[in-house]
Amino acid sequence: ENSSILVVTEGVFGMTGDLGILPEIIELKKEVPFRLLVDDAHGFGTLGHDGSGTGTQLGCQDGVDVYFGTFAKAGALIGAFVASEPNVIAFLKANSRSQIFAKSLPLPIVATARERLKLIRQHPEWREKLWSNTLKLREGLQKIGYNVLPSESPVTPVLTSGSTQLCTDIMRKMREEHGIFVSGVAYPVVPRGVVLIRLIPTAAHNDEHIEKTLNAFEAIKDFVMAAANKLSA
């Protein structure tokens, strides 16, 4: 049955690493006809037995009508793609402003993306390594005393009380004093008075990298906790 309703959600919510409730959303199609578009920027390449994303991980990929992915995360490249039925793709080609007023990806980028798709499928051990690194990082941060939010993906969010200035200071200290890049998120992306530091380990990291990161977080812990306590006082 055709429907003009389009439901849009994420496979992995990039700030917290939570997975979208795709099976529950798809189940609603039995009551209300709609199409489902899933932005799976963080799930593509990292989730599912073959890296094909959150839908595969949750066993409901066939219920996704329009699938959006990017090569900029797991693919370490540039560019993105939309996968759907031929008539949907034809509609997007003719009506998407970003498609009409943009140039195609350079051929070397396309060729590289195709090869990296093959590598993602052929090397499940890379995903195993990714998850091993993710668990080591999370467990280490928790042992130090940081509040690591539950996450079902490699996205590792560390939450603390603090100001926008604290967020900036943490990023600066990690980068300039320890040579580690972290992504800081402050108000209005998160509630006022909250700072979220986001880390995303990769399969290319090793135990030495993780240990260095944990040591750096331990080194700035007193500074972070003092700022958090000052805000809550």
Where does each model-flagged region fall?
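Short, small-residue-enriched loops and turns at beta-alpha junctions
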Residues: V12-T16, G43-T46, Q99-I100, L159, ...
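Active-site PLP attachment segment
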Residues: D50, T56-F91
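Active-site phosphate-binding strand-loop segment of PLP-dependent enzymes
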Residues: E1-V38
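A short glycine-threonine-serine/GTX helix/turn-capping micro-motif
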Residues: I78-G79, S96-L105
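Short beta-strand
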Residues: I5, F68, A102-K103, N147-E152, ...
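Conserved PLP-binding catalytic core of the aspartate aminotransferase-like
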Residues: R127-R138, Q142-H178, V189, V194, ...
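A common structural junction motif
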Residues: I100, E176-F181, F217-M225
